[in-house]
From Swiss-Prot:
The gene is SWEET1. This is Bidirectional sugar transporter SWEET1. It is a multi-pass membrane protein. One of its GO terms (cellular component) is endoplasmic reticulum membrane. Residues 7-94, 130-213 form the MtN3/slv domain. The keyword Repeat applies. GO terms for biological process: protein homooligomerization. The keyword Transport applies.
Amino acid sequence: MNIAHTIFGVFGNATALFLFLAPSITFKRIIKNKSTEQFSGIPYPMTLLNCLLSAWYGLPFVSKDNTLVSTINGTGAVIETVYVLIFLFYAPKKEKIKIFGIFSCVLAVFATVALVSLFALQGNGRKLFCGLAATVFSIIMYASPLSIMRLVVKTKSVEFMPFFLSLFVFLCGTSWFVYGLIGRDPFVAIPNGFGCALGTLQLILYFIYCGNKGEKSADAQKDEKSVEMKDDEKKQNVVNGKQDLQV
């Protein structure tokens, strides 16, 4: 295996591990409060599916020289499974049913891909089938921050887009993109090239808006207006009281 190929793969493992562990802060809060509050559980089973498909694609009988792809995505699959189970434990009944349904579909999709690739396909056909499946869900995973980027542009604030998370999205996408180029593997290079581009856009947005306080939310503006009205009422009451004393 090419030394540069290995170096970028190891670096990709490190940055991807950071991204997988990033939601642990959210889950500490969920466990502490014994509630999922307003957090969405959808990203975790979807990321789990991406990890399972990518880990499967990296296995030697599917694609050669991609063991590092399997190791990090196998680790990610374990981490995401833990997240899903915690979310299911603390979620309200309606949300629990929805997330369990998505989780079941994820396992069904992965099982279908694995069984078809094992018993119906061989050689390049197997690699093509598994690679396409992994690529589609990798792009979907990388595209998930688009809503946050839109929020940043709308509010002119980076409050909901932490710098280090954006940085590691960029580093992870870039390292695996180069890894795919060196290994001449389009199924690794293409989705991670997309991730590299999105990470770059996130960093550009961060540096454009990092000095802004941003537009306040409607609720915050409403609260401030309410406080101001109460202050005005107090001042008016004081004035009226003084007038009564003078009379």
